[in-house]
């Protein structure tokens, strides 16, 4: 019997970046927060689903707030101080995620809405009748 091979896992290298971009992608079902450096390389990320929220709880503003806090803390551990915010999507967690980023101590320099708007593209889903 052969001994089990130990696989060497790569240790995550802590980057030291002072300014970056916080991408908040807020959908109807989830909120993802990714903080990158200015070139677009990922520094930290979090989402409502990754924090343990399941089902319809993922789409709440509170879940978005927690996701933004987790991503911001991880980014601040790597030296992040200033951040530009770009928000994409129609979800409920847009504003609460921005407020949460500001509350953790990151200085927000600009807020951009980069929600894609179709020039009469595909047909939208039918209205829900509940």
Curated annotation (Swiss-Prot):
Q: Does the keyword Transport apply?
A: no
Query: Keywords in UniProt for this one?
Result: Ribonucleoprotein, Ribosomal protein, RNA-binding, rRNA-binding
Q: Name one GO cellular component term.
A: ribosome
One GO BP annotation of this record: translation
PROSITE patterns the UniProt entry points to: RIBOSOMAL_S11
Q: Which Pfam families match?
A: Ribosomal_S11
Organism domain of life: Bacteria
GO MF, one term, reads: structural constituent of ribosome
Do you know which InterPro entries this protein is assigned to? Ribosomal_uS11 (IPR001971), Ribosomal_uS11_bac-type (IPR019981), Ribosomal_uS11_CS (IPR018102), Ribosomal_uS11_sf (IPR036967)
So what does this one do? Located on the platform of the 30S subunit, it bridges several disparate RNA helices of the 16S rRNA. Forms part of the Shine-Dalgarno cleft in the 70S ribosome.
Mind telling me which HAMAP family this protein's record contains?
Ribosomal_uS11 (MF_01310)
On subunit structure and binding partners, the annotation says: Part of the 30S ribosomal subunit. Interacts with proteins S7 and S18. Binds to IF-3.
Q: Which family does it belong to?
A: Belongs to the universal ribosomal protein uS11 family.
- Record's protein name: Small ribosomal subunit protein uS11
Q: Which gene encodes it?
A: rpsK
């Amino acid at each position: 019997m052969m001994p089990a091979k130990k696989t060497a896992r790569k240790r995550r290298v802590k980057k030291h970046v002072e300014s970056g971009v916080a991408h908040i992608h807020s959908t109807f079902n989830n909120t993802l927060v990714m903080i990158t450096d200015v070139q677009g390389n990922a520094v930290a990320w979090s989402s409502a689903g990754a924090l343990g929220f399941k089902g319809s709880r993922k789409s709440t503003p509170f879940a978005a707030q927690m996701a933004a806090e987790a991503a911001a803390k991880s980014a601040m551990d790597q030296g992040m101080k200033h951040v530009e915010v770009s928000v994409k999507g129609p979800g409920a967690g847009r504003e609460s995620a921005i407020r949460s980023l500001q509350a953790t101590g990151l200085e927000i320099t600009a807020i951009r809405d980069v929600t894609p708007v179709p020039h009469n593209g595909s047909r939208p889903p039918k209205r829900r009748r509940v």
